[in-house]
Amino acid sequence: MSFSVDVLANIAIELQRGIGHQDRFQRLITTLRQVLECDASALLRYDSRQFIPLAIDGLAKDVLGRRFALEGHPRLEAIARAGDVVRFPADSELPDPYDGLIPGQESLKVHACVGLPLFAGQNLIGALTLDGMQPDQFDVFSDEELRLIAALAAGALSNALLIEQLESQNMMPGDATPFEAVKQTQMIGLSPGMTQLKKEIEIVAASDLNVLISGETGTGKELVAKAIHEASPRAVNPLVYLNCAALPESVAESELFGHVKGAFTGAISNRSGKFEMADNGTLFLDEIGELSLALQAKLLRVLQYGDIQRVGDDRSLRVDVRVLAATNRDLREEVLAGRFRADLFHRLSVFPLSVPPLRERGDDVILLAGYFCEQCRLRLGLSRVVLSAGARNLLQHYSFPGNVRELEHAIHRAVVLSRATRSGDEVILEAQHFAFPEVTLPPPEAAAVPVVKQNLREATEAFQRETIRQALAQNHHNWAACARMLETDVANLHRLAKRLGLKD
């Protein structure tokens, strides 16, 4: 088989139709899956010895949240090293990163796999992966044809990365010195709320404004602070963290501003405070609403004049520090109640950011679950950690009052429980592995009244075909076991499968 000019033109056109990079990438992947007739396809970006999914088709949604470290995925490492088309034999001993992640085929191993590394010049920037359930699925395509596909995808990805870099530079102040690239914190989520938050982070990071980050406990406010710092001109300098809620009143001032020897009992030497440590960098004050009014006044002075005084010292020290503050309180209410200074609130909230709670982020919960599943897989040395359909349904309908932190702990606990109930190094997370309070789940989709588009015979055959497929998937394509599950004779099952087009 060879690609026609029309096929290649269609791929190129799809790359131009999208409004944004994400839309273009999704169109590319969807078109490729149709053209190559594969069961699953993915476009991955390469960054710091890991592949990050940008768009997928035919794979479970949680794949978008996973981060595939090369040391944990030998097939992806082989693709990264190859420099050309990589075809993995059906009996390859290297585990496929997508085993168990093709919906409806969770219990089956991927058979056919092709990897296409994507380059910009001599630099690896990403990869295309194509997977199929049949061992010879991609034999009809030559390496040269697959290289054409890779070239189109590489061009699209390279242009997107270049535009992203230029847009980031254009947001920098005109007199800012270009800074060395720093590994960026990954903020996982494609919901409207997270997309807007990422845009706001990109805008404010390039400035030197103080930022107030608000959000419920466990939403990831510290991660937002890291993302702001890493995308700022101060990225090569320190990001210093201080949890104001954990500060005893007796040492709070010393922690912030430092002290000199003999300033108080126990001050046996001079000590720098967090502001000095963060000089020319960023200071992140977590739970700032917990600071006393007296300390708020001293913090305000630093923000106004840029100088500090160590405890026990009359001299002032100049510091150049950007302050990022976070709170899970409504500071406006705290101001009205007299527990927080209005002038400090206005100094801090020049550019306020609000981190949405997990219950308002829709399918982001599945992406984050995928991320934590992959983390657990690497930490525990497992071959795979997969979410069942029931587990995904449960996660999507639980409110998560503890937000992302609660989800992380729930995934880790579920992996440990699942691992204890089955042998081997493969873990499938079921709904019963999650100890959530009662969750009201919607009725199964099958309970909905379908729109009739077939006659009775066609509908019956479609139902039989899907039932046999699911039974085969659950029994690793063992026809005898499948027949036992369906309570039918194996010979009759073979004849029915042939009539339904499931067997040659």
Swiss-Prot record:
* Regions annotated as coiled coil: none
Instruction: Name one molecular function that GO assigns to this entry.
Output: ATP hydrolysis activity
Tell me the classification of the organism that encodes this protein. Bacteria, Pseudomonadati, Pseudomonadota, Gammaproteobacteria, Enterobacterales
Biochemical pathway: Nitrogen metabolism; nitric oxide reduction
Location of the DNA-binding region in this protein:
479-498
List this protein's GO terms for biological process.
phosphorelay signal transduction system
- Main function: Required for the expression of anaerobic nitric oxide (NO) reductase, acts as a transcriptional activator for at least the norVW operon. Activation also requires sigma-54.
Amino-acid positions noted as binding ATP in the UniProt annotation, renumbered to this chain: 215-222, 278-287
Sigma-54 factor interaction domain boundaries: 187-416
Q: Which InterPro entries does the record associate with it?
A: AAA+_ATPase (IPR003593), GAF (IPR003018), GAF-like_dom_sf (IPR029016), Homeodomain-like_sf (IPR009057), NorR (IPR023944), P-loop_NTPase (IPR027417), Sigma_54_int (IPR002078), Sigma_54_int_dom_ATP-bd_1 (IPR025662)
- Give one Pfam family, short name only: GAF
Please state what the protein is called: Anaerobic nitric oxide reductase transcription regulator NorR
Q: Which UniProt keywords apply?
A: ATP-binding, DNA-binding, Nucleotide-binding, Phosphoprotein, Transcription, Transcription regulation
Carrying 4-aspartylphosphate, the residues are D57
HAMAP family per UniProt: NorR
